[in-house]
A protein has these predicted regions:
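N-terminal organellar transit peptides
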Residues: 1-130, 134, 141-275
Length: 275
């Protein structure tokens, strides 16, 4: 960048955060009563509350606010996530689907929108991806901790008392029973089928077509466009422009969500939650 601007190595660059840039977007078109909200979803997806990633409770509340805010005429959902919890992704997707019933929802992929990050985009009217975005990864996996060998080497044993065969399917010391493995496998397979089902609905494809490119395969944005997993290759600005077109807006302002909170606000919020 310094070379392009004919600056010396020691010269400082004046920088602006992307959220500030978006907030000042297209000043000539600003109209306070017509707002396009850019909802940022960055990081892994988790259940519960938190501020350093995508937490389902926080995001569900944020989406509901956007749904009920009459000034917000359209939402651009900016996703930059490798995925995470299936349950949390489900909660977010459901709320996005409710939002879409009231106003246009356009998705814009950042550097990556994979697995759950792709899944939560399935409630959108249209998906924009950058050519080099890492996306797809339509798949599900589960992990069960097993310390049986470590326990054996250290002479640790456990003697479970149970009421039926399924009461102790998983033990950190004794491992997983065949029944437990079977149940876990069925759960993962069921979640995968649900994932593919939502993709088939949004992308207007058959189960077989999505399954063929699923199984956890990671794709570039360009490849995803070729096989119909995204609608257009484009930037965040392209998504905003389309959202304005979809909402029939000529004058509007753009606002970034969720609103940033300071470290002190996070601290006091956590204290309130602990009480």
């Amino acid at each position: 960048i310094k070379t392009k601007l004919n600056l010396k190595e020691k010269d400082k660059l004046n920088k602006i955060s992307f959220s500030k840039y978006i907030s000042s977007y297209s000043e000539d078109n600003m109209k306070k009563d017509n707002q396009i909200a850019v909802l940022y979803a960055s990081g892994a997806i988790y259940n519960g509350e938190g501020y350093d990633a995508i937490y389902s409770e926080n995001f569900v509340k944020e989406i509901k606010k956007l749904t009920e805010n009459d000034k917000v005429k359209a939402v651009v959902f900016r996703i930059n996530s490798p995925g995470g919890s299936a349950n949390a992704s489900d909660e977010i997707l459901f709320e996005i689907q409710q939002l879409k019933k009231k106003k246009p929802v356009i998705v814009s992929f950042g550097d990556y929108a994979a697995s759950g990050g792709y899944y939560i985009a399935m409630g959108a009217d249209k998906i924009y991806s950058e050519p080099n975005t890492l996306t797809g990864s339509i798949g599900v996996f589960g992990m069960i901790p097993n310390f049986k060998e470590i326990a054996n080497r250290n002479g640790l044993n456990s003697f479970p008392v149970k009421t039926n065969a399924n009461s102790n399917m998983h033990s950190l010391i004794n491992g997983v029973t065949p029944g437990g493995i079977n149940m876990m496998t069925k759960s993962v397979e069921g979640t995968y089928k649900r994932f593919v089902h939502f993709v088939t609905q949004n992308r207007k494809k058959s189960f077989e077509q999505i399954d063929e490119v699923g199984g956890g395969r990671v794709l570039s944005g360009t490849r995803a466009k070729q096989i119909g997993l995204v609608d257009e290759l484009g930037t965040l600005n392209d998504a905003i422009n389309y959202a304005a077109l979809k909402a029939k807006l000529k004058q509007y302002n753009v606002a970034a969500y969720p609103k940033k909170i300071s470290v002190f606000e996070q601290f006091f919020k956590n204290m309130e939650d602990d009480e």
